[in-house]
Amino acid sequence: KTNYRASLNYKKNDGMIRNTSRETINGSIAVNHRAFDDKLQLSFNLANSFVKVDAVSDDVDKVGDIPNYGILYQAIRINPTMPIYKEDGSFWETYSGYEDFNPVARIYQRTKKKEFKNLLANFKAQYEIIPGLTAAAFFAMEKNDALTNDYSMREEYSQYKDGTNGRAKKEYYQNTNRTTEWTANYNTSINGVHNITGLLGYSYQDFEYEQFSAENKNFLTDVFGTNNLEAGGYLKDGKAEMKSKKETSKLIAFFARANYNYDGKYMASASIRREGSTKFGANNKWAWFPSVSAGWMISREDFMESQEVFDVLKFRAGFGITGSLPTDPYMSLATYGTGAGAWNAYTGSWLTATYGPNINPNPDLKWEKNESLNIGFDFGLLGGRLNGTIDWYSRTTRDLISSYNAQQPSLIYNTITTNVGTMRNRGIELALNAEVVKTKDFSYTANFTFSYENNKLTSLSNDVYKSSYEDQYDLPSPGNPGKAYRLQEGQPIASFFGYVCDGINP
């Protein structure tokens, strides 16, 4: 038995800013096959998408010391009486000491064209060895790549003001994720009331990321855009920029899970995972992650038969530990680089720094662990017309991964990435679903949700690394009070600190 499905979709949307659009093509195919009296099941899925974006190069950058926050920001803050065009039809620009560029001019003088490709393919084979016992193999690959062409014309505000006469940049990245998973699943029922399922498995994930970019400035013409990077004068002067990098990491897991259900009244589940990642130090790549949960369908008990309030009433509780991965795959290793170098005005060339350490190694870097405790009730009343859930939870994150000042000597670099700190989240969640009106021809339902959470950074220090708070971000001008966002022990994440105003000086 074989069945298949295929789809193709095309969509184009124009942006709210002139000369901007997004064009998308999506295609997919799915094939399923059964054989040997349905004991063997095969499935294959393939999905591909192509996206083309015409945008405005509107990244946050700087002209001199003045930040540029983009076209929409500039359209709001600029003098509304400033003209858009000069009498000769060219764009009006003030070239003042402030970043008061013409937002309409930027639409036409800066372009950013992006092309995205996404490929997702997976294959699964499952075979029933004996009744109740199945084995499965799963293979998947996801591949994303993007090409960006970014060009600023010679007369564009920042180029003309800085005398750089045009800027062209090409950037490409590719992200690949491969997954292999093997599982064995067993389920059985004893006397129709004892229902048992079990799972054993192994998974392997491989991540690979590559990026390349090249940028040049000082062009004689805008005709070529980003298609003739070598024509820019910065390349001859040794000031053109090129960057590339490649990152790889692996994640391996062994796991097991068991579920038990007695006659729909009592439920219990337990699982264990042993996971290892190349992102952690040599001494702590592996960690255990257990979980347990239980449920009690109170409304099915004999003593509940005489009551008429609850149609459904279920109690449940669970506790589990999960792990978090750092974003950078090399935080535990000693990496080296040349630094940014410097421009030598006397020789007219770049001075390149020699190779030196970028970070200190930490062979003891380990998993962040998230401990979660959840207790809740599910209920139904009024013949099923009112249903809801209520939950209380407590989540504690231990061994937070962060950067701390390092002792010099003996360490080479002045900071180190390590595990310090604890954060706690506690809260209540309530969800209600009511069938307010239900007739033959009309029905009306209402939903209500409520949540409350208390967050606290309980610790930022240990016996070796000390910190009571860490300043993060500034507030924007005017009236910048300095660092206003702070991580501080005993306070919630995202706490704001600033001067206390006593009033206005008359």
Predicted feature locations:
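Short strand-turn segments of transmembrane beta-barrel domains in outer membranes
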Residues: K1-T20
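Transmembrane beta-strand segments that form the barrel wall of outer-membrane beta-barrel proteins
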Residues: L8-K12, A268-S277, F319, E435-V436
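Surface-exposed loop/interface segments of Gram-negative outer-membrane beta-barrel transport/assembly proteins
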Residues: M16-I17, N26-N118, F138-I252, R300-E371, ...
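Solvent-exposed loop/turn segments connecting transmembrane beta-strands
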Residues: M16-R18, T278-N283
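Feature captures outer-membrane beta-barrel proteins of Gram-negative bacteria and organelles
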Residues: G27-N32, W288-W296
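Alpha-helical support elements that line or immediately flank enzyme active sites
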Residues: A121-Y127, F139-K143, F379-L381
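Structured alpha-helical segments in the cores of large, soluble enzyme domains
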Residues: I252-Y262
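Glycine-centered tight-turn and secondary-structure capping sites
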Residues: N374-G376
